[in-house]
């Protein structure tokens, strides 16, 4: 299996399976001197973790990071950073009955067709367990971006099934298990998810992610566009079926006079472009959203075939998320941070001597 690495100057390679002994990653290209300690990974890893509420998978992993290399006396050395998390709560017997069956809507069939062999335990490499290491690598990128440029990356759940936020408050996002920006709606979400779990079905979701403080100039104009690489990064997350930058698909119904972000010396008057023009950051907030499909691991029977081609009904037992989007916010944040750090290093390598060009337009102003 190839294509397990991400990035150009700042790269991340992940490895491991859902029910293997461990998962891990190698982070290469991190500048030396960044202070980092194992306990700094805990917050974001726990934000992504399952088993924290009745609305996610009951699997409980400690997700304790081991730093194997690339850090000496608490500081990065500039050499590859090896990170490892040992799996401790696998329950592979849950998959014995479907080991030879292809779950509809899952990667079982495509992995089988590509490789002629697959690990059925928990989805193997196609499991969202892999994203744990993306979040771990993202901790490094987030810290470097914040210290070096003041960039803050954060996200929230912007749709759960048919439900959308009735208001917005960043302070509310971290105070509920949904990363929902309107606290008054949390009871409604709880009721909705309780009914969904009882029915045995699943539902899709949407996550928005925002990076504030991104300087103008990051990104490359043709094949290394910031928005193209960000879209690819978010699309690589399990279950993601669509990505928007800025207004995205809503742009189809807009007029040019509405969509263009007017510029004044005091700042841009809007941000329909999502902080990116011509593949290069404008200095405004970089905004993106991703849509996640409903999980296909259901306890409701569904028609499929097995490895022999026989028609069967598949029922997935075990521990699964009825909505994978609930835990996806820290994953989206991590992928945006990884893209931004890689682009920042590439910009510095080629254009570091350019300096600040006038006029420098501030980000969006309140109108």
UniProtKB/Swiss-Prot annotation:
It holds the Pfam family Chorismate_synt. Residues 41-60 are annotated as: Disordered. InterPro entries: Chorismate_synth, Chorismate_synth_AroC_sf, Chorismate_synthase_CS. FMN binds at residues 125-127, 238-239, 278, 293-297, 319. Reduced FMN (FMNH(2)). CDD domains: Chorismate_synthase. It comes from the Bacteria. GO terms for biological process: amino acid biosynthetic process; aromatic amino acid family biosynthetic process; chorismate biosynthetic process. This reaction introduces a second double bond into the aromatic ring system. Homotetramer. This is Chorismate synthase.
């Amino acid at each position: 299996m190839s294509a397990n690495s991400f990035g150009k100057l700042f790269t991340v390679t992940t490895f491991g399976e859902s029910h293997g002994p461990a998962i891990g990653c190698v982070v290469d290209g991190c500048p030396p001197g960044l202070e980092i300690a194992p306990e700094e990974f805990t917050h974001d890893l726990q934000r992504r973790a399952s088993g924290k509420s009745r609305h996610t998978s009951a699997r409980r992993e400690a997700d304790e990071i081991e730093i194997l290399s690339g850090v000496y006396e608490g500081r990065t050395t500039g050499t590859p950073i090896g990170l490892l998390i040992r799996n401790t709560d696998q329950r592979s017997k849950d998959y014995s009955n479907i080991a030879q069956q292809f779950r509809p809507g899952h990667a079982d069939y495509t992995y089988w067709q590509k490789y002629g062999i697959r690990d059925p335990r928990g989805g193997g490499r196609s499991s969202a367990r892999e994203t744990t290491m993306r979040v771990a690598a993202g901790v490094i990128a987030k810290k470097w971006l914040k210290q070096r440029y003041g960039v803050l990356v954060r996200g929230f759940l912007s749709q759960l099934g048919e439900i959308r936020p009735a208001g917005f408050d960043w302070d509310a996002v971290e105070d509920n298990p949904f990363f929902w920006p309107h606290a008054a709606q949390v009871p409604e979400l709880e009721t909705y998810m309780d009914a969904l779990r009882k029915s045995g079905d699943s539902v899709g979701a949407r996550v928005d992610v925002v990076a504030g403080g991104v300087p103008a100039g990051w990104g490359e104009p043709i094949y290394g566009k910031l928005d193209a690489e960000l879209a690819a990064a978010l699309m690589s997350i399990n279950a993601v079926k669509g990505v928007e930058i800025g207004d995205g698909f809503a742009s189809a119904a807009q007029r040019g006079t509405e969509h263009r972000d007017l510029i004044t010396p005091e700042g841009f008057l809007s941000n329909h472009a999502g902080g990116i023009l011509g593949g290069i950051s404008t200095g405004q907030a970089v905004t993106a959203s991703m849509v996640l499909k409903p999980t296909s691991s259901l306890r409701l029977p569904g028609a499929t075939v097995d490895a022999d081609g026989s028609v069967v009904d598949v029922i997935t037992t075990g521990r699964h998320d009825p909505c994978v989007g609930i835990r996806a916010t820290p994953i989206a944040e991590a992928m945006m941070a990884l893209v931004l750090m890689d682009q920042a290093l590439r910009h510095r390598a080629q254009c570091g001597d350019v300096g600040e060009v006038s006029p420098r337009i501030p980000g969006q102003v309140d109108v």
